[in-house]
C-alpha cells in the first residue's frame, strides 16, 4: 500500500510525539527530499506573473462598465441626505420635484428608491449651496485665494497601509465635495490600480516633471557658464523632451468625477538612479523643490483643493520630493512593536535627511547673505492602522 505525503508526515509527527522529542529530530532527509517539488527556474517567475496578471484582470473587470472602465457605485437618497448633503429626506424630494432640471436619479421600480451618481450628487450639492438655507454649509470649507493643501503619506516600512490610507482619505475628501488630485510616487503603482489609471511608461508619471525642473535649472546655469566663457552642460534628448511636458499632459481622470490622478508604473523607479546623476552634474540644483515648483508653475495647486501623495516604502529621492512638497505628513503604522520601532527609525532618518539638506544649503546661504532654508509641515500625525480595539 502506497502511503501519501500527508500520511508520512503524520507518522513522523506521531513517532516524534511518542519519543518525547521535537518533530525535527525525526526528519528523514530522503523523505523530505521526496516531499519537495521540482526546482524552480527563472522562467517559472514569468509564468507566475502571467497567472497573477490574469487573476488581476478578472478581479478588476468586475468593477468595470461596458466600456472597460472602472465605475463608481450609485448613492441612495438616504445616503445622500444622511452623509453627503445636510437636508431632510422629505425636503430633498420636494426640491427635486420642484426643479425637474435637477438630476432625478434612477429607480428600478415605479415609485421605488432613487439612486444617484456622485456627479449628480455634486450638482445637487451646488444647487443647495446656491438656493438652500444660508445657515447650512453645503460645500466643504475652502479658503479663497490659497493653493491646494498637499498631504504626503509616508513610512519606509512596507505593509503599514500607506496606499490604503491615502486612497480612503482621497475618496472621503471627494465625497465631501473637494477637488482631489492623487499623485502616485510608488513604482509599484498600487494607487494607480485602485483608481484605474493607465500608465504606459515613465513619461506618464511624475518623471518628466522632475526632468523638466532639472532641464530648466540647467538652461539658467548654462547661460551663466556662457557669460563666464565656460562650456555649457549639454541637454540630452531626455531633458529636451521633458521641457515639452506639463502636468496637464500627465493628469488623467478617474471613475470618481472629482478625483484626478498622476499615475505610476515600474519604470518610475528609474528616477531613483537618474536624479543623483543630475545632482552630481549640477550641485546647485535643488532637487527637493522639483515637484512643488512644477505643480505651482503649471497651475495645478490652484485647480485642486487637496493633493494626496502616495510614497514608496523607502526614503529615496521620490519620497524626499513628496515630503518636501507636502503641507501635512501622515505616517501610518500597524499596532505592533516591530512597526512602532521601525517608525521611530523612520523619524530619525527624516531628521537626518532634511537636517543635512538644511545644513548644506544654509552654509552657502549665510555666506551669500540669503534667507536660510527651513523645512516645515503644518501637521505631522502618526496613523495607527490594522488595529481593532475589540
Where on the chain are the PLM-derived regions?
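P-loop NTP-binding core
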Residues: 2-83, 89-90, 94, 101-390
Amino acid at each position: 500500500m502506497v502511503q501519501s505525503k500527508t500520511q508520512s508526515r503524520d507518522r513522523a509527527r506521531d513517532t516524534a510525539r511518542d519519543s518525547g522529542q521535537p518533530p525535527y529530530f525525526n526528519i528523514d532527509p530522503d523523505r523530505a527530499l521526496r516531499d519537495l517539488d521540482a526546482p524552480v527556474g527563472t522562467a517559472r517567475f514569468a509564468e507566475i506573473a502571467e497567472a497573477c496578471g490574469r487573476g488581476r484582470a478578472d478581479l478588476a473587470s468586475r468593477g468595470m462598465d461596458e466600456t472597460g472602465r472602472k465605475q463608481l457605485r450609485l448613492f441612495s437618497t438616504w445616503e445622500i441626505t444622511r452623509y453627503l448633503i445636510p437636508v431632510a429626506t422629505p425636503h430633498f424630494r420636494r426640491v427635486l420635484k420642484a426643479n425637474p432640471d435637477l438630476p432625478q436619479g434612477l429607480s428600478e421600480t415605479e415609485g421605488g428608491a432613487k439612486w444617484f451618481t456622485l456627479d449628480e450628487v455634486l450638482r445637487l450639492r451646488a444647487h443647495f449651496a446656491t438656493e438652500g438655507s444660508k445657515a447650512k454649509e453645503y460645500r466643504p470649507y475652502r479658503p479663497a485665494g490659497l493653493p491646494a493643501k498637499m498631504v504626503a503619506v509616508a513610512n519606509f516600512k512596507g505593509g503599514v497601509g500607506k496606499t490604503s490610507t491615502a486612497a480612503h482619505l482621497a475618496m472621503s475628501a471627494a465625497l465631501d465635495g473637494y477637488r482631489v488630485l492623487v499623485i502616485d510616487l510608488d513604482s509599484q503603482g498600487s494607487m494607480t490600480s485602485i483608481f484605474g489609471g493607465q500608465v504606459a511608461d515613465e513619461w506618464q508619471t511624475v518623471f518628466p516633471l522632475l526632468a523638466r525642473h532639472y532641464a530648466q535649472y540647467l538652461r539658467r546655469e548654462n547661460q551663466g557658464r556662457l557669460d563666464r566663457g565656460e562650456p555649457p552642460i549639454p541637454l540630452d534628448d531626455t531633458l529636451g523632451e521633458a521641457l515639452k511636458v506639463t502636468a496637464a499632459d500627465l493628469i488623467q481622470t478617474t471613475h470618481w468625477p472629482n478625483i484626478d490622478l498622476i499615475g505610476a508604473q515600474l519604470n518610475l523607479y528609474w528616477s531613483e538612479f537618474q536624479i543623483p546623476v543630475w545632482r552630481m552634474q549640477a550641485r546647485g540644483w535643488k532637487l527637493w523643490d522639483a515637484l512643488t515648483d512644477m505643480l505651482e508653475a503649471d497651475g495645478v495647486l490652484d485647480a485642486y483643493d487637496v493633493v494626496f501623495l502616495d510614497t514608496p516604502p523607502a526614503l529615496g529621492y521620490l519620497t524626499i520630493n513628496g515630503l518636501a512638497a507636502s503641507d501635512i505628513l501622515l505616517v501610518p503604522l500597524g499596532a505592533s512593536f516591530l512597526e512602532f520601532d521601525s517608525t521611530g527609525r523612520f523619524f530619525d532618518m527624516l531628521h537626518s535627511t532634511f537636517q543635512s539638506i538644511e545644513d548644506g544649503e544654509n552654509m552657502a546661504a549665510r555666506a551669500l547673505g540669503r534667507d536660510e532654508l527651513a523645512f516645515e509641515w503644518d501637521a505631522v500625525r502618526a496613523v495607527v492602522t490594522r488595529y481593532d480595539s475589540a
